[in-house]
Amino acid sequence: VMACEDELSWLDMHINVNKTFCIRIGPKYRVDPAKIVTRSGLEIEWADTIRYLGIYLRRHCVFMCCLDNHKRSFYRSFNAIYGKIGRVASEEVIIQLVQSKCVPVMLYCLEACPLKKSQLQSLENVIVNCFMKIFHTRSKETVNDCIEMFNLNVRKLLDRRRVTFLKTFATRNDRNTACCAFKARCMADLHCITV
């Protein structure tokens, strides 16, 4: 912390302990961490989840994103749309609005996050629940057919977004060492996805 504070003071900045949190990621994530105190004597809190650039990161043994806020934002926008036009608009119109307004909210930055199968399944369940509401059915087969027909399969959407993200990053001409290492990883991931 002292090294960070030295750099920040050189830039005429300081650590705002009201907006700064620490999170532990790794095998010892459950161990109670030591308190971190700034030079001014203020304590930086440890958190279970933190928000960084719109993504919520969770304290865990591996780097992991928390999708609760993504799903909550999706449902908020879906309910706003469905509450206004659900009874008067056709299913196609509602799905087009969901595709253009709600899905981007749910998938925001997830192309850069590693997701587990259970997390992907929970995102798929969000879409399934919405389709059940739109088409007034409880049939999984019907809903899955509709999801494929309207091209709203979450795994396919994320794969497309991930390919675009990796291609964009792979074509950058950045000489930073960390960026070069990540670029090599992007190329390998891109090869795995497209094969």
Language-model region placement:
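Basic, alpha-helical interaction scaffolds
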Residues: 41-114
